[in-house]
């Protein structure tokens, strides 16, 4: 509550800013709130439920192991035993996930596919964090990164740590400039990877 009080004081103290600037500040703050990691919540409900809540709160979708249907409504998250619903796939298209929220993924053990499309807050740090998580290094088989303007070669090269990656699509990433070097690095480190590049 004190945090909200401090932020609201800051917002009230800012005067005569253009509406668009004020609005941008507010939405940036709100997105940061949505991404904040609550470690007590992870402990209480388990990593898959807490990560599901985070992802859906930010506008992403999840699919659970053994299910065909994508879960996209925060208010209709399934209930039941904590170990019943394990995240198998994440579609973060048009979501506001950002690096401060990626600690939610630490305990996930069944994620096989991640799609990051038009994620304006995704940066290299997100991919670096993702590739450092030992569970995800083992389980991720497919990734798609599309139209994420803040991603550069540094973030993409970190994906070499995903040692079981079988399919990687990179599309419309203006910050990725060393295509030939990336192709060579992936061929060397992950020879069975199907790498699809749709880059300028």
Curated annotation (Swiss-Prot):
One GO term (biological process): ATP biosynthetic process
Endpoints of the signal sequence: none
UniProt keyword annotation of Transcription regulation present: no
InterPro entries assigned: LRR_dom_sf
Residues engaged in binding Mg(2+): 59, 93
Protein name, UniProt field: ATP synthase subunit s, mitochondrial
Family: Belongs to the ATP synthase subunit s family.
Organism listed in the record: Pongo abelii (Sumatran orangutan)
UniProtKB keywords: ATP synthesis, CF(0), Hydrogen ion transport, Ion transport, Leucine-rich repeat, Magnesium, Membrane, Metal-binding, Mitochondrion, Mitochondrion inner membrane, Repeat, Transit peptide, Transport
Function as written in the Swiss-Prot or TrEMBL entry: Involved in regulation of mitochondrial membrane ATP synthase. Necessary for H(+) conduction of ATP synthase. Facilitates energy-driven catalysis of ATP synthesis by blocking a proton leak through an alternative proton exit pathway.
UniProt subcellular location: Mitochondrion; Mitochondrion inner membrane
SUBUNIT field: Homotetramer. Associates with ATP synthase.
């Amino acid at each position: 509550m004190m945090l909200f009080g401090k932020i609201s004081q800051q917002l009230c103290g800012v005067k005569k800013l253009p509406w668009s600037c004020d609005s941008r500040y507010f939405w940036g703050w709100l997105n940061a709130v949505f991404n904040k990691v609550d470690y007590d919540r992870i402990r209480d409900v388990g990593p898959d439920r807490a990560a599901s809540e985070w992802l859906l709160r930010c506008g992403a979708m999840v699919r659970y192991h053994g299910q065909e249907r994508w879960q996209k409504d925060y208010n209709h998250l399934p209930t039941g035993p904590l170990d019943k619903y394990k995240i198998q796939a994440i579609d973060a298209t048009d979501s506001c996930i950002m690096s401060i929220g990626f600690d939610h993924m630490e305990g996930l053990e069944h994620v096989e596919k991640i799609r990051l499309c038009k994620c304006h807050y995704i940066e290299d740090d997100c991919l670096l964090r993702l590739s450092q998580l030992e569970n995800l290094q083992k389980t991720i088989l497919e990734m798609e990164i599309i139209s994420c303007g803040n991603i550069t070669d540094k973030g993409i090269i970190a994906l070499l740590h995903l040692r079981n990656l079988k399919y990687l699509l990179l599309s419309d990433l203006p910050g990725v400039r060393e295509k030939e070097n990336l192709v060579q690095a992936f061929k060397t480190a992950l020879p069975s990877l199907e790498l699809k590049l749709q880059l300028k």
